[in-house]
Structures are given as structure tokens and as C-alpha cells.
Amino acid sequence: MDTRYYIVMVQDYGEVYEYEFPDLYRARYLMSVEQLPCSLWECSPQSSNRRLLDSRNATRKLAI
């Protein structure tokens, strides 16, 4: 049984929000529609390790 889960971390004005998903499809969907800097992580509950899968808009600055 695959027990991996996925987290999308979204950065907004100094705050970081984590959204947990049971499957990669839903996590990638949030990554595709999110306008703020975000990253996608694969997580293993057995080892508590995270592996970076994708990072978007990391260097993009939004005008206020």
C-alpha cells in the first residue's frame, strides 16, 4: 500500500501555508493554478522525510 502524501507549500507575504493532499494529481492541480510562490513535496510518514518535486514562481516578485 502506498502511504505517501503530498504537500504544497505556498508563500504569501512572509507566511508559509501547507496544503496536504493524498494524491499527486490534486497537489499538481493546486500548483498549476496558484499564482504565489509555491513548492510541491513528496512525504513519507514512515521516515518523516520530504523530497522536493517541483518549485514555481520562486523568484517572481508581485507588484503591490
Residue ranges, per PLM feature:
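Intrinsic-disorder/low-complexity regions
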Residues: 1, 11, 22, 48, ...
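Short linear motifs in intrinsically disordered
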Residues: 1, 28-33
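Short aromatic-glycine-(Arg/Gly/Cys) micro-motifs in beta-strand/loop hairpins
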Residues: 1-16, 45
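Hydrophobic beta-strand residues in large extracellular and virion-surface proteins
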Residues: 7-8, 21, 27, 40
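A short, exposed loop/beta-hairpin motif centered on an aromatic-Gly-Thr core
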Residues: 13-29
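Short, mixed-charge low-complexity intrinsically disordered segments
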Residues: 16, 33-64
